[in-house]
Structures are given as C-alpha cells and as structure tokens.
C-alpha cells in the first residue's frame, strides 16, 4: 500500500487525473471504476482539462460508478447520474453512452437492479483502476461499518453519520435518501489497481484507522490491506503525522 501526502486537494487531484488520462491514452479499451462526492470535484475538473486539451479518443473506454442514492431519478440534481454528467460526461461528451454504467436508484425493484448491476460488473471483468473516497466512518462506496467482506452489489441502509455528512448537499437533512445501491466490498477488490483520495481534517481519523487498525468490518476501508495494488493520496489536513509530504514534481 502506497500512501502519499501531496499537500493539497488540487495537487493530489491533478496527479490522479494524470493517472486516469494515461490509462485511457495507453489502453483505449480500459475499464474505470469511478466515484462521486465532494472529494472528486477537482479530480474531474483536472481530467476534463486534460481530455479537452488533447482530444483523446475515449469511445471504447468503459466506466462503472460505485453507487447511487435509492429514490432519486437520474435527473435529480443530487443523484450521481446528474453528478457524473455535470462533472465529466457533458464536459467531455465523447464517451460512448453504452459504455457508461451507473446503478439505477429509481428502479421499480431495487434488489433486482442490484443483481443486474452486479451481473454487469461480472460480465465486464476487472476494472483497470478503481477510484475511491472514504467516509468519516471508514466506509468505501456506501459499504457502511458491518458490511460483510464478501458482499457484492446490494442495497444499503445509510447510517446516521453518513446521512448527516451528506446533508450539506441537500436543502435539509430530511431530504437525504436513507438508502443507496452500492458495489460491494468484493466487487471493489476485483479491480487491478485501487486509488483512494481523502482530503480535509474530517477524513484524518478514517485514514488513521485505515492505516493502523487491523482488518475489521467495523472499518470497511481496512479491507484494502488485502489488495496488492492500493495507492492513497492525501492533502495536509487528512494526513496522519507519520506520512511524509511529497511534491508532485518529485514523483516518477
């Protein structure tokens, strides 16, 4: 597991955007696992700049999002469908829509939708890169504490802490969905390479637990210790004291 403090959200996001760009440039049929939320905004902004500058052919790139709120239509401003369109797919409108995969949070039968999305993941095979954030309680995707390590795509009852943390995106806390559909922990670990981003002081405790705690369902992110190719990029605020700071221009 590689852990680096790149100083700022902007610097870390730029570095990871370059990693995604290189993957798409050198592997035109690559499969990318994508994440959403406030952590990822600079990442997509930087990636869009790189794509637009170089007019990269992404017609054969496939994307797979981690999760979606249950009960929100794709057109809802707080849905992750809307987020991805707003942050990436409309900003660089050359991705093939048939290769964009995001769980449907407004399906009639959500358990059937979870099964269908899991089938898609299994049929498409390993993602080349999986992008992750981390919740303040150590969740990855929407896999809350207590989620079995062998879980696949499923419906999640969100914890009070997650609902409260996400309430800043809604008019009031009562508007935050109480459930989500999420890739399971087993799905996440199927990726060839995992890149986790964490920014801000509120994420420091979760990162400290991830790095120092034994693998436990109480902190789902600790399962990443079982994966052979994990990279964690932090800013100063999220970084535990024992992780040295490095500048992007010092990296290979």
UniProtKB/Swiss-Prot annotation:
It catalyses: alpha-D-glucosamine 6-phosphate + H2O = beta-D-fructose 6-phosphate + NH4(+). PROSITE patterns: GLC_GALNAC_ISOMERASE. One of its GO terms (biological process) is N-acetylneuraminate catabolic process. The keyword Hydrolase applies. The active site is at residues 67, 137, 139, 144. Catalyzes the reversible isomerization-deamination of glucosamine 6-phosphate (GlcN6P) to form fructose 6-phosphate (Fru6P) and ammonium ion. The keyword Hydrolase applies. One of its GO terms (cellular component) is cytoplasm. InterPro entries: Glc/Gal-6P_isomerase, Glucosamine6P_isomerase, Glucosamine6P_isomerase_CS, NagB/RpiA_transferase-like. SUPFAM superfamilies: NagB/RpiA/CoA transferase-like. Keywords: Carbohydrate metabolism, Hydrolase. The lineage of its organism: Bacteria, Bacillati, Bacillota, Bacilli, Bacillales. Gene3D superfamilies: 3.40.50.1360. Pathway: Amino-sugar metabolism; N-acetylneuraminate degradation; D-fructose 6-phosphate from N-acetylneuraminate: step 5/5. Its EC number is 3.5.99.6. This is Glucosamine-6-phosphate deaminase. Transmembrane segments: none annotated. One of its GO terms (molecular function) is glucosamine-6-phosphate deaminase activity. Belongs to the glucosamine/galactosamine-6-phosphate isomerase family. NagB subfamily. Pfam families: Glucosamine_iso. HAMAP family: GlcN6P_deamin (MF_01241).
């Amino acid at each position: 597991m590689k852990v680096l403090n790149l100083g700022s959200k902007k610097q870390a996001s730029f570095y990871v955007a370059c990693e995604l760009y290189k993957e798409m440039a050198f592997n035109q049929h690559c499969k990318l696992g994508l994440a959403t939320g406030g952590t990822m905004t600079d990442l997509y902004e930087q990636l869009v700049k790189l794509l637009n500058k170089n007019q990269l052919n992404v017609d054969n790139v496939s994307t797979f999002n981690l999760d979606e709120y249950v009960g929100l239509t794709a057109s809802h401003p707080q849905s992750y469908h809307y987020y991805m369109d707003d942050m990436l797919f409309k900003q660089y409108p050359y991705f093939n829509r048939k290769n964009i995969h995001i769980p449907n949070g407004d399906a009639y039968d959500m358990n059937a939708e979870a099964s269908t999305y899991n089938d898609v993941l299994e049929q498409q095979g390993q993602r080349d890169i999986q992008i992750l954030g981390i919740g303040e309680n150590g969740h990855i995707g929407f896999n809350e504490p207590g989620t079995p390590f062998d879980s696949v795509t499923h419906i999640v009852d969100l914890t009070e802490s997650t609902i409260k943390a996400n309430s800043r995106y809604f008019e009031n806390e009562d508007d935050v969905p109480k459930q989500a559909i999420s890739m399971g922990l087993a799905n996440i670990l199927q990726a060839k390479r995992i890149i986790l981003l964490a920014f801000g002081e509120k994420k420091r405790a979760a990162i400290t637990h991830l790095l120092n705690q034994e693998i436990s369902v109480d902190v789902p992110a600790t399962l990443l210790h079982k994966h052979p190719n994990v990279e964690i990029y932090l800013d100063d605020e999220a970084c535990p004291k024992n992780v040295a700071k490095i500048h992007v221009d010092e990296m290979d």
